[in-house]
Structures are given as structure tokens and as C-alpha cells.
Amino acid sequence: AEKLEESSAEAKALSYVHDATTSGHDSYQEGQKCINCLLYTDPSQEEWGGCAVFPGKLVNANGWCTAYVARG
């Protein structure tokens, strides 16, 4: 799988960023990032990993998008 580009249409549609702290989106809350999101497929992947929202792409573990769902 290849890394998701922030500039891609799919990433922009969900305001995806590689570094959550740079988000600036109204829904972003401090501490939220891909690695602690329910949609991140393998939390043991600490740098880049799969995401249910972006099939076939890798997202940054420290990234964020508007589909964020806190992992139980």
C-alpha cells in the first residue's frame, strides 16, 4: 500500500493531515490521532498503518481526519 497524500481528493474530502496537531479543523480535539482511532486497522503500527476509510492507503499514526472515532 502507498501512503495517503494530503493533497489527494480523498484526503481533502475528510480534511486529513499527517500531523494531527496542525489540523486546525473545528472538530479536532487535542490528543486525537490515527493510532488511537477505531478505524486505524493495526494500532501496533506506530508510524504508518491502514485505515478503514482509505482502503489501500497508509495513513500516518500521528495523523487525523474528520472520520476520527475514539478507540474504546
UniProtKB/Swiss-Prot annotation:
Molecular function via GO: 4 iron, 4 sulfur cluster binding; electron transfer activity; metal ion binding
Residues noted as binding [4Fe-4S] cluster in the record, renumbered to the chain: C34, C37, C51, C65
Organism ancestry: Bacteria, Pseudomonadati, Pseudomonadota, Gammaproteobacteria, Chromatiales
PTM-bearing positions, type N-carbamoylalanine: A1
Designated name of the protein: High-potential iron-sulfur protein isozyme 1
Stretches of the chain forming a coiled coil according to its record: none
Family that this chain belongs to: Belongs to the high-potential iron-sulfur protein (HiPIP) family.
Gene Ontology process terms (BP): aerobic electron transport chain
Function: Specific class of high-redox-potential 4Fe-4S ferredoxins. Functions in anaerobic electron transport in most purple and in some other photosynthetic bacteria and in at least one genus (Paracoccus) of halophilic, denitrifying bacteria.
InterPro entries cross-referenced by the UniProt entry: High_potential_FeS_prot, HIPIP_sf
Assembly with partners or alone: Homodimer.
Keyword annotations of the record: 4Fe-4S, Electron transport, Iron, Iron-sulfur, Metal-binding, Transport
Pfam families on file: HIPIP (PF01355)
